Amino acid sequence: MKKYILSLDQGTTSSRAILFNKKGEIVHSAQKEFTQHFPKPGWVEHNAQEIWGSILAVIATCLSEADVKPEQIAGIGITNQRETAVVWDKTTGKPIYNAIVWQSRQTAEICDELKEKGYSEMVREKTGLLIDAYFSGTKVKWILDNVEGAREKAENGDLLFGTIDTWLVWKLSGGKAHVTDYSNASRTLMFNIHDLQWDDELLDMLTVPKSMLPEVRPSSEVYGETIDYHFFGQNVPIAGVAGDQQAALFGQACFGEGMAKNTYGTGCFMLMNTGEKAVASEHGLLTTIAWGIDGKVNYALEGSIFVAGSAIQWLRDGMRMFKDASESEVYASRVESTDGVYVVPAFVGLGTPYWDSEVRGAMFGVTRGTTKEHFIRATLESLAYQIKDVLCAMEADSGIELKTLRVDGGAVKNNFLMKFQSDILDVPVERPVINETTALGAAYLAGLAVGYWKNQDEIKEQWHMDKRFEPTMEAETSEELYAGWKKAIEATKAFK
């Protein structure tokens, strides 16, 4: 009987189930979008029950359409939108509030208070993160402080917290496994990335009871099995978990120190593997856990850019400049340059290395001769400039010079953007054959745990390149363009 690995990719806007075979190829996939809730400006929430429903739906669709029986699944890997926080009742299994999404700014005031109390240095040292509404810790505190009776229930040990991976493992296992992996734990603001434990000092700071927290385990091991009534009568090992960006790093086979990938999704996330050492950042990067496997923990430096693919969506839906995102490449290629136009897409502030949530988007250098084509090109170029900002910070922090950048995500189909990215970074950009690297990474982690794949060397052999973009731009030109971007950033920051 032919066996497969099932990868569950629970993202910000949709849930997907993807079946992989022994060669790391996609056999079939199914996708289902779910509702985004915006109760107040800057707030973003999801219904965790709806997410769970979407996962059950895509599993059923994927298996039936592929004509694969549940007993043919050797293991399940889970990858997830990170930082998004769910708090649920241990007994009823029902969330006590919507999941607060990573993008949501509703805990910004809590963060300001913590900074004023002087916690920043301690948080940075222990977690590798900044005090920011982006991470899970303040979201949990907000739920406990704002949902009636929640704090009392939490103190009594009646509530459980989890990032989305934890929620899904708990549901799939019928409430038997309350676990997370190192990569997801490292994004909560409550986990010490050096001694690999939930940290009492951080929990006191956030007033979160320890009894709510999941057990932290490696990213590749069997956490439990599916309870039969959630998996067509089968007990399948749930065997791999990693946050989406770390899973993509693993799926891109960036196993060596200094290897890096950039994912172009809603936002952009660039991670560089720093091996078994946690490199502290002096340049606004995050130090995070890449994965834990074979008794070892790998660390990474991460740069987070809040607006990437969503800038292209904005051109399409908000500005109505084209009907399909793929047209952006056509328009951008019609002009030789932006004619000095810069777009800074700070719609929800700026991430790495600026970390300024107050700034908003801006546009510079506009003349009467500026056209739609210039505007679209400038928006695409802004994605590449933001990655350059991140790379400069990474090289400064790690002392490692990047040799090539592996890329994935929706926008990598845009050849104009990939070529410009290579030019502005002055390094080759490699696009893989399988772009679903996030789901692939989770599949690999699960497959290794159940012996479906032997080791990381076998996985490395499966990475194949679709196209390599080489830099051809004169250094002087790219430096000039980047200097203009830096000026645009300064001007944007001045306007608040």
Swiss-Prot record:
Q: Which family does it belong to?
A: Belongs to the FGGY kinase family.
Q: Which reaction is recorded as catalysed by this protein?
A: glycerol + ATP = sn-glycerol 3-phosphate + ADP + H(+)
Supply the name of the protein: Glycerol kinase
Query: Under the cellular component aspect of Gene Ontology, which terms does the record hold?
Result: cytosol
UniProt keyword Kinase, yes or no: yes
Q: What does the record give as the organism's lineage?
A: Bacteria, Bacillati, Bacillota, Bacilli, Bacillales
Quote the InterPro entries the UniProt record gives. ATPase_NBD, Carb_kinase_FGGY, Carb_kinase_FGGY_CS, FGGY_C, FGGY_N, Glycerol_kin
| Subunit record text | Homotetramer and homodimer (in equilibrium).
Pathway in which this enzyme or protein is active? Polyol metabolism; glycerol degradation via glycerol kinase pathway; sn-glycerol 3-phosphate from glycerol: step 1/1
- Positions bearing Phosphohistidine: 230
**Residues bound to ATP:** 12-14, 266, 309, 313, 410
By its UniProt entry, which SUPFAM superfamilies does this protein fall under? Actin-like ATPase domain
This protein's UniProt keywords: ATP-binding, Glycerol metabolism, Kinase, Nucleotide-binding, Phosphoprotein, Transferase
The EC number(s) attached to this protein equal 2.7.1.30
Residues annotated to bind sn-glycerol 3-phosphate: 12, 82-83, 134, 244
Q: Which GO terms describe its molecular function?
A: ATP binding; glycerol kinase activity
Question: Where ADP is bound, by residue?
Answer: 12, 16, 266, 309, 410, 414
The protein's organism comes out as: Bacillus anthracis
> Known activity regulation?
Activated by phosphorylation and inhibited by fructose 1,6-bisphosphate (FBP).
Note the Pfam families from the entry: FGGY_C, FGGY_N
Modified how: The phosphoenolpyruvate-dependent sugar phosphotransferase system (PTS), including enzyme I, and histidine-containing protein (HPr) are required for the phosphorylation, which leads to the activation of the enzyme.
What function is annotated for this protein?
A: Key enzyme in the regulation of glycerol uptake and metabolism. Catalyzes the phosphorylation of glycerol to yield sn-glycerol 3-phosphate.
Annotated positions binding glycerol? 82-83, 134, 244-245
For biological process, the GO terms are: glycerol catabolic process; glycerol metabolic process; glycerol-3-phosphate metabolic process
